[in-house]
Amino acid sequence: MSSIRAPGVYFEKVEDRLPPLGLGPTGQAGFLGLATRGPLHEPVRISSTQDFLDTYGAPLHEGFLAEAVKGFFDNGGKVCYVVRIAHTSARSPEGCAASSSATLQDRLGQPTILVQARSEGTWGNEIRVDVRTPPPAVQALLVRDISPGENFAQIRSGRGFQVGSQCRIYDGAQERYVTVNRVEGKALFWQDPIDVGFKSSAPTFIEPLSFEIEAQVPGYKERFTDLSLSPASGRYFARFINAESQLLRCVDQISPSPFPQSLPQEASRLMLEGGADGLADLTPHDFIGYNKGPGDRRGLGALEVVEDIDLIATPDLFAARELSRGRGFRSDKDVEIVHEAMITHCERLKDRFALLDLPPKAGFDRALQYRLLFDSAFAAFYYPWVVVPKEGRKRRTIPPCGHIAGVVARCDADLGVHNPPANAIVEGIVDMEMLLNDDHLGQLNHQGINCLKYAPARGIRVWGARTISSDPDWRYVNVRRIFNTMRRALEQGTQWVVFEPNGPTLWKQIHRTLHTFLEQLWLKGYFQGATASDGFYVVCDKTTNPPENIDAGILVCEIGIAPVRPAEFITFRISQHMEDRASEDSMQR
């Protein structure tokens, strides 16, 4: 209170605090590639090389994804998202990735459980399954007689019983089976009354019946005990195994046999079979994919829903060309189709940047020829391929995109998005596929190919930061990524504007918020100019919001920035629809 007043209820107007704007995380890559195992067409957050190996298994001999992800983390990357690619087709299962499986029979020979490998691939053909029905872990003594028509029992101890326990009641002369639906201390209840009576003096025992499944591959074993066929049980096999297993997923076939004949038969050394990698028939469409909504996304379409991604890379495109043996990928033209789709993906979402690889063993002329097929500010080529160490003294040549993504992430963290990711050392490589002389470096850089250069005593470094755009205003990677990062920040940070009264008060609030945000970026070196007004401007008033816009429910704020390179102003124009939202880039020379 500003002054002492008489006791009572008072109302004070407090100015709302608007959410501050800020740049979100950058340098988070989305990788599409081939792997031994792991979920297909599903983006998985990966935070280390070991995390990748735990999820996707040992590196695939024919692919480059594992080495690319390792290169990302070796060079300073912190988080990436991986989408495993394989051939999948709704039209025909032939040539498609498939999970290994085996069907368990019940005691009457009816199918009761479908056991599958956790993910598609031939890796699942090495899974061995054992099924056992062990003796009951607990046995409770009946302490009160059960009369015919009753549905409960009093026992000496309720330990080991739970909702969903499938139990045997027996006295040596007869037996019945019930599924517990309630446990109250030492009392067990079930749904259907039993048709016979049991005497506590017989004696009568009640015991839960269960089974166990053990799965193993060379070097790893897992065992699941006390499993139940009842969906009401906390140990219901399908739910429990699917949540806990690294190897299996199970499907309840719902046996028609009565319990306990519906329990699976014991099995020893049962090998899963039928797994397929789906690599020989890979097509460009497997990488491009689609986004038809939750549960129906493939390839690039699966990455659309991951908002944090701002870099994308596909290290296995040329591996797919070799694996398909001329069926799905017939030539570099098919690789070109995927590269074009990656560029379109980034241009459409407007907050991502594609890191592209040139063909392996491409000489100067071939590299230049392939690069000139594209024109976009949302992508960059890096060249040549790099040599990485393998176990022992072996080496392997791989595309550079994963290592470059890590360099970009490191530069973002250390210097900021506005600094070009160039003249930065590339960690984790021991050589390059070919060494380029200064003449080649100059010509390739001029044409928008970012080369790797060996500098004596300074290691192998990224020696360029150009996009593949023919527009000089978008020549540099950092300029495009400044806009990408700002766009994302502005779109996310101005959500509060929608449905607010469109008038001078709102315009002033927006102007203040945006000016503060841009001033902070200018102080960090994102924009040129000795003063803030030299580096950016913000206009949000009646000149950008005439009556016809207000009547149409549209709010327009105009932002101009002078990025550190090039030196011209480039206008960033944001149109806010009060019922919805839209944004656009425009240029001002």
Locate predicted features.
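Structured, hydrophobic secondary-structure cores that serve as assembly/anchoring elements
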Residues: 1-107, 113-118, 170-173, 216-219, ...
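Autoprocessing Asn-cyclization modules and mimics
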Residues: 97-116, 122-197
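Short, cationic low-complexity segments
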Residues: 137-139, 234-240, 578-589
